[in-house]
C-alpha cells in the first residue's frame, strides 16, 4: 500500500490551525514521512510521549520542580518525607531560541484529558511559533483534524 503523501496539505493545515489531532496507521511510517517533510520545509521537530507530562503547559514552557525516584533508604531529616525537589528546565525553551518554527509531536495523546488538550490548544494560540501534533489513536489511513474540532466532537 503506497502512501503518496506530499505533506503540503498537512503543513498548510498545521500552519493555519496550529494544533492538530492525528489518527495514523498502527504499523507506523506515515508520521515519520510527515516529520521528514516538515523538517525539509524549515521546521524544528521534537517527538515526545504524552504519558507522564503532568500539566503539559507547565512541563513544556515553565521552570518546574520534580521529585527524583526513591532509591531506597535516604536521610529523612535532610529533605523531609517527600524528598528533595529538583528544578527542571522547560523542554521547549532551548528550541525556541532560534527563529525556526517548532513542531512538537506528542505520541499516545489518547491518555490526555479534555482539559489538558484544551490547555495545549491554548498554548498553540498564545505562542504562534509552536505547532503541536497529537496522535490520538490509530486508523487504517492517516487522518487529521484541528484539535478543537476533535475535542468538541467527543
Curated annotation (Swiss-Prot):
Localization in the cell: Cellular thylakoid membrane
Pfam families linked: NdhN
Membrane topology designation: Peripheral membrane protein
Keyword Transport belongs to the record: yes
Top-level EC class: translocase
InterPro entries, per database record: NAD(P)H-quinone_OxRdtase_su_N
Top-level taxonomic group: Bacteria
Keywords, in A-Z order: Membrane, NAD, NADP, Plastoquinone, Quinone, Thylakoid, Translocase, Transport
Description of how the protein assembles with itself and partners: NDH-1 can be composed of about 15 different subunits; different subcomplexes with different compositions have been identified which probably have different functions.
Organism: Prochlorococcus marinus (strain NATL1A)
The protein, known as: NAD(P)H-quinone oxidoreductase subunit N
GO MF terms held by the record: oxidoreductase activity, acting on NAD(P)H, quinone or similar compound as acceptor; quinone binding
Function as written in the Swiss-Prot or TrEMBL entry: NDH-1 shuttles electrons from an unknown electron donor, via FMN and iron-sulfur (Fe-S) centers, to quinones in the respiratory and/or the photosynthetic chain. The immediate electron acceptor for the enzyme in this species is believed to be plastoquinone. Couples the redox reaction to proton translocation, and thus conserves the redox energy in a proton gradient. Cyanobacterial NDH-1 also plays a role in inorganic carbon-concentration.
Record's catalysed reaction(s): a plastoquinone + NADH + (n+1) H(+)(in) = a plastoquinol + NAD(+) + n H(+)(out); a plastoquinone + NADPH + (n+1) H(+)(in) = a plastoquinol + NADP(+) + n H(+)(out)
Family that this chain belongs to: Belongs to the complex I NdhN subunit family.
EC number: 7.1.1.-
GO cellular component, one term: plasma membrane-derived thylakoid membrane
